[in-house]
């Protein structure tokens, strides 16, 4: 008789039904919000991951890597972002001048010690948005993952959030942190001695050193951020508060991959970390593409299923109907506009909106690229009067209604 490999697990029919419900809910939820599915190979050339995160312990110590018959080093993917960025560049999507919103699902592989909710072959649900990052896009992505998990019945979700600032902020802090740690080098564990020169931020994740007073009193990366980076982060926090996302700032949070910049976050339920993500300003260029930014997150499916099973919660999201685009003309109205977006989405409508602010003509062109049935315009006059202007793209007719009548108006258009 043969046995499964250590760190893997079988999903029997009694389990796959529950998994399918969550998978279908994930597909439905992010399709409704204008994300498109992407599927990349489970194997990549090892250089893809080394270029993406050369100092990461996941890449240097936990990957399944082997030479093929032509002696090229192949790696079973340990995470989703690098392979998706490789595909984004190889297929010239970085040259389209269009924001690309992907979602993905599949198996991943890491050679680490198996424990509760953690396997050597595991599954992730994830999202990557490539082409730009703005604080408003950070708000959107974090709000969506928060609302997706709440749609599954997980009401006690907390987003642990921090900012790593720009690349320049990051480098300044690393110098300060390394100088500080040299004083206490005798107190570092063996692994953290290695980290000190390769990836010192990972010392914050050490379960041994983290308990010691010298690390508790160490300078935090947030203190090294430029005023511009701090302002960006505060914009994100203000937006999450406006969207009633339960979050907690955590200046010890650094994440395990060294390509992150600015916003980083982890998704927790009680004490269980379900996943995490963040922004990356230089990853696309590092893999040979244009200088473009992105933001993404991944959820561990195994951990999510354990959490759902403990709470007996499963929910399948409804399919979207009409396709709407809310054109917010001024960032002053952003929080109000985003609230309207989610009111409509919660009624099953497919709604997109602008993440950045430019001239009316350019903004209108970007809106029409999404091929909406209706264009909703929120300008100064509409905001002041609590109204919204609605343009039917097909008939070219236009009307202005009170915002409180939005749901009723579009329910009538469904008939």
From Swiss-Prot:
Belongs to the class-II aminoacyl-tRNA synthetase family. The keyword Protein biosynthesis applies. NCBIfam families: hisS. The gene is hisS. It holds the Pfam family HGTP_anticodon. Its EC number is 6.1.1.21. Its main location: cytoplasm. It catalyses: tRNA(His) + L-histidine + ATP = L-histidyl-tRNA(His) + AMP + diphosphate + H(+). It is an enzyme of class 6 (ligase). This is Histidine--tRNA ligase.
């Amino acid at each position: 008789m043969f046995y499964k490999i250590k760190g893997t697990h079988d999903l029997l029919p009694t389990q796959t039904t529950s998994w399918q419900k969550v998978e279908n809910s994930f597909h439905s939820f992010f399709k409704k919000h204008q994300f498109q599915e992407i599927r990349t190979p489970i194997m990549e050339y090892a250089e893809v991951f080394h270029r993406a995160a050369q100092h990461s312990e996941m890449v240097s110590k936990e990957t399944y890597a082997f030479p093929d018959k032509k002696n090229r080093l192949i790696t079973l993917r340990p995470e989703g972002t690098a392979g998706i960025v490789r595909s984004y560049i190889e297929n010239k999507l970085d040259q389209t001048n269009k924001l690309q919103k992907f979602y993905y699902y599949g198996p991943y592989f890491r050679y680490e010690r198996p424990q509760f909710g953690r396997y050597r072959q595991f599954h992730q649900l994830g999202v990557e948005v490539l082409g730009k990052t703005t604080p408003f896009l950070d708000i959107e992505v974090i709000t969506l993952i928060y609302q997706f998990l709440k749609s599954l019945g997980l009401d006690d979700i907390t987003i642990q959030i921090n900012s790593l600032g720009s690349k320049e902020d990051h480098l300044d802090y690393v110098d300060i942190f390394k100088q500080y740690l040299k004083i206490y080098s005798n107190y570092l564990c063996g692994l953290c001695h290695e980290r000190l020169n390769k990836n010192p931020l990972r010392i914050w994740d050490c379960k041994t050193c983290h308990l010691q007073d010298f690390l508790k009193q160490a300078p935090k990366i947030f203190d090294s951020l430029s005023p511009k980076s701090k302002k960006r982060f505060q914009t994100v926090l203000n937006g999450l508060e406006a969207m009633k996302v339960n979050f907690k700032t955590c200046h010890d949070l650094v994440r395990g991959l060294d390509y992150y910049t600015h916003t980083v976050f982890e998704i927790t339920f009680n004490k269980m970390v379900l996943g995490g993500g963040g922004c990356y300003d230089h990853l696309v260029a590092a893999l040979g593409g244009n200088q473009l930014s992105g933001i993404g997150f991944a959820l561990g499916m195994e951990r999510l299923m354990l959490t759902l099973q403990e709470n007996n919660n499963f929910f399948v999201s409804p399919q979207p109907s009409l396709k709407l685009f809310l054109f917010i003309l001024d960032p002053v109205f952003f929080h109000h506009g985003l609230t309207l977006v989610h009111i409509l989405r919660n009624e099953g409508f497919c709604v997109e909106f602008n993440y950045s602010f430019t001239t009316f003509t350019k903004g209108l062109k970007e809106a029409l690229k999404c091929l909406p049935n209706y264009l909703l315009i929120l300008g100064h006059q509409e905001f002041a009067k609590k109204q919204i202007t609605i343009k039917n793209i097909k008939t070219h007719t236009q009307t202005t209604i009170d915002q409180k009548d939005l749901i009723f108006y579009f329910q009538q258009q469904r008939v």
